[in-house]
UniProtKB/Swiss-Prot annotation:
Cited function: Complement inhibitor. Prevents complement-mediated C5 activation by binding to C5. Binds C5 at a different binding site than the other tick complement inhibitors OmCI and CirpT1, and the drug eculizumab.
Any GO MF annotation of the entry: toxin activity
Keywords: Complement system impairing toxin, Disulfide bond, Secreted, Signal, Toxin
Protein name per Swiss-Prot or TrEMBL: Complement inhibitor RaCI2
Amino acid sequence: MNAVTVLAFTAFALIVHDCYSEEANTTPISVKDQCANVTCRRTVDNRGKRHIDGCPPGCLCVLKGPDSKDNLDGTCYLLATTPKSTTTSTEQSFNMEE
């Protein structure tokens, strides 16, 4: 019984070794970063709504400054996944009474 177990374990180890020791032909994924060196800007329209413009689809605008400021510049960064929406402007509500 022990000999059968050892033989089965050895066979399994050899199969696993063969499967994972082969060198696979891989092609590195080269993603063109459309967000590199792209700046974005947050502005407020006359109705008090914040707008973020400047980043292409699939990029996230990271603003440089506190959230309390309305007009800020930022940098676009590539997201891990591309959103289904193709809009490049984001609107946020802004309460002028605060």
